[in-house]
């Protein structure tokens, strides 16, 4: 790669990639260009002109997906009743336990989200440095199970009081957050690790059309499938909110506790079927050292051994390229806190908003299921119809998808703001729903709950473009032995979004909610456009960056093989392997 100054790196666009996009519509069968045989590596001309398709998803991906489904079933099944559990009291409507009111409950809800997305850093460090993804997931599953049990016990009516339940809730949130963080940073890289890292190849369809089987599209499809399984698991909110509404909170917490055992079972039974990438020796420390040298000199060539033969670096030039690519990805992630702040409204202020409306017998937190249903319906539509249709005419690359995710998120907030305006205009309590007079204490404003449905649909569509693509981007741009760590950096942006939510929680109260929602919508809209103009040229370097992955084809195989020099000397690891 030619010498590039760091400050100009993200502005340099290789002309051949621009050329590839400009000619993406061409489907020429010009005889003057040689045609590669089926199974062969496509020529530059074929890379520019042939349609790209995905390979089949390996069976081991299904096993990892079951693990994630059960973990997300548990996570969403627990967290959806949290807002009511924290906000209300036993005699309020909707009923609760801790009595923290909307502002306090929203702040604690954001802390819960913040904690769950900070802890992936720790889980990723353990995985990439010592245990590997599989055994890290196993250990943190046990941690998460302990936290759920604490939550269940302290919610039992025979034990529960505001003091006991609050103490138990805080301890449970901390322990569950550690567990889910350790799982979350590793399970998505693990499912993508199951895909063979093979170069693009020519395939002839039954119709006679010659296409390119593109691994990057396979990875994209796997993450869409992964996200689909997440949202099938997230349908647990229907069951847990009904249990909360008709039985009690302890029943809503018991169901996820039991279902989580399914994921642990899939994890154990699939032990010998997973592809397990070897752990790198101090790879995170080496990456930070490499990045520090490059940043201190404002030039990545300063860290390349080929440019400094008199110095001994514990890496090669290709490793520097991977670190550089990972830093590009981290720059893209910098805009995500605004998006996650918007997304977080679904878990707190949307629930509180629904509680101000006429529910007609429904729990106010059950509408979150619409978000999951949206994703379950539209992920296959995008994967099978929308994306292939767009790719027939033009590349539909990561930065473009993320931009549209921001736009859908902004639309969701604006709609919520308009809806809140009409809630305030409806009686009987207008700007202070259920709080204007003792006789209207439990009487909502006269507006139907169904009008909130588009909020969840728009958030769901934004996730397809922003959240799924972010997972894919974090995986494909990370060095091979740092997949979990870079994924945790992406997840950390959610924690920053939650921190912003904590800062804004004092204004999450009536009668300020119209301004809150609309302000978030405008912020997300502006952030999306700034993101687009800042990073749209990254689209043209996708193939170049993805090609760096293929030098590690030998690391992706169905059994775990460790280089003796890379074997971590950790007795916990060996003991766990013996009994897992």
UniProtKB/Swiss-Prot annotation:
Glycans are attached at residue 101. One of its GO terms (biological process) is oligopeptide transport. It is found in: Cell membrane. Disruption phenotype: Leads to a marked reduction in the transport capabilities of di/tripeptides. GO terms for cellular component: plasma membrane. Residues 1-30 have a biased composition (Basic and acidic residues). It is a multi-pass membrane protein. It holds the Pfam family PTR2. Residues 1-45 are annotated as: Disordered. The chain crosses the membrane at residues 57-78, 107-127, 134-154, 163-183, 219-239, 249-269, 326-346, 370-390, 402-422, 449-469, 484-504, 513-533. It catalyses: a dipeptide(out) + H(+)(out) = a dipeptide(in) + H(+)(in); an L-amino acid tripeptide(out) + H(+)(out) = an L-amino acid tripeptide(in) + H(+)(in). Keywords: Cell membrane, Glycoprotein, Membrane, Peptide transport, Protein transport, Transmembrane, Transmembrane helix, Transport. Its main location: membrane. One of its GO terms (molecular function) is transmembrane transporter activity. Peptide transporter that exploits the inwardly directed proton motive force to facilitate the cellular uptake of di/tripeptides. Shows strong uptake specificity towards the dipeptides Tyr-Phe and Gly-His, when compared to PTR_A and PTR_C. Belongs to the major facilitator superfamily. Proton-dependent oligopeptide transporter (POT/PTR) (TC 2.A.17) family. This is Peptide transporter PTR_B. It comes from Candidozyma auris.
